[in-house]
Regions:
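Acidic/polar, glycine-enriched structural segments that form the non-catalytic walls/loops
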Residues: 19-358
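C-terminal motif of bacterial Sec signal peptides marking the signal peptidase cleavage site
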Residues: 14-15
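Sec-dependent signal peptide recognition
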Residues: 2-8
């Protein structure tokens, strides 16, 4: 597949006409390929991120309906540092999952295996295949009434502005128009959102226990007894939550502009309810309690715009607008989107395997 894409790219470039050397209009190149979403589609989620942290949203611009997307492209919130291991009461050792093999190097070598026969070796192998696993740091979405269904979200107009790294979502819910902007800080594990609605909805912060599964949304909602979320500090404009899962801890710092009330709805489930029709909040995830200054939505948005404009104006890009091959437009779209996804999902300090952070 990789060779096919390379061949198509070379063929399309050969079909391009360039009567004179001209600088590529990078802004036009990027913005004409901005993704747009017009339906609640589990395969059309959008993401913001910075390589160290990524946050994926549904058509509301937040993670309002994670259950709808769990079998498609799940709504993840993940970081490079966010790892967890289940307890190891049987005290399995790494060497118990290894077997000696002769690979023709003149001596036997240890190799990790998956024993099929029941016994301690299989149990040890199974434990190490599951642990450690990356954590879903938490769902951040609209808190809606129980009877609201995804189909009630109408007139969806959502776009990802890759030039500035911001998702803009417009929709109506029970005849109320909503306008939500979502952005990620380029250097912190932080998202920020701006909500505008005549009847503002609350914001839910719902924290799952991990599943340890391979192809799921990493959310176990049936294990509240195995983890906790504690409100460790709060004032009129901010709150800090401490998450504890077995031996793993991390912190969630929420701040907001305007009047709002944070309440604990149930175990590992908090709701922030604003009173103003326009409401903004940043939310930061950290492995330790953070002493960093609290930022505003405007500051996060400004930092994101500067970061992404620098990203797109540095390094190589490919403009297919002068190509005569009918496949050129689609190929250009895939190249630009791949550059964006690479930056948010795979360009961190430890590039993740396969699909990226979320």
């Amino acid at each position: 597949m990789k060779h096919t894409i390379y061949a198509l790219t070379m063929f399309a470039l050969a079909a391009c006409t360039s009567p004179q050397e001209e600088a590529i209009d990078r802004h036009a190149l990027v913005t004409r390929n901005n993704p747009e979403v017009t339906a609640m589609d589990s395969l059309s989620s959008l993401s913001v991120g910075n390589g160290e942290f990524a946050y994926t949203v549904d058509a509301t611009g937040l993670q309002t309906f994670p259950e709808v997307y769990k079998n498609g492209v799940p709504l993840g919130t993940q970081s490079q540092w966010g790892w967890h291991s289940f307890g190891n009461p049987e005290n399995y050792k790494p060497e118990e999952a290894l077997v000696e093999y002769d690979f023709g190097h003149g001596h036997k070598e240890l190799y990790a295996t998956q024993p099929k026969e029941p016994g301690r070796a299989k149990e040890a192998s199974d434990w190490y295949r599951v642990n450690p696993h990356r954590l879903h740091l938490g769902i951040i979405g609209l808190e809606l009434e129980n009877e609201v269904r995804p189909s009630d979200v109408q007139n969806i107009q959502q776009s990802l502005d890759m030039w500035n790294g911001i998702i803009t979502s417009r929709f109506t819910l029970k005849e109320t128009p909503y306008h939500i902007q979502t952005v990620c800080h380029p250097e912190r594990d932080m998202i920020a959102a701006r909500l505008s609605a005549r009847q503002p909805a609350g914001i839910k912060f719902h924290f799952p226990y991990p599943t340890g599964g391979h192809c799921d949304d990493a959310c176990n909602w049936e294990a509240n007894d195995k983890h906790s979320t504690t409100l460790v500090s709060e004032d009129a404009q901010s709150a800090v939550l401490k998450r504890t899962l077995d031996a793993t801890t991390y912190y969630v710092t929420i701040s907001w502009e305007g009047a709002a009330k944070l309440r604990e709805k149930s175990a590992n489930y908090f709701v922030l309810t604003p009173t103003d029709s326009v409401f903004t909040f940043p939310c930061q995830f950290t492995p330790q309690a953070s002493a960093s200054p609290i930022l505003t939505f405007a500051e996060v948005q400004q930092a994101s715009s500067g970061h992404w404009q620098n990203y797109w104006t540095q390094g190589a890009v490919a403009d297919f607008s002068q190509c005569t091959d009918v496949r050129a437009k689609e190929l250009e779209r895939r190249v630009v989107l791949s550059q964006y996804l690479l930056a948010i999902q795979c360009a961190g300090s430890t590039p993740p395997q396969e699909t990226g952070l979320t």
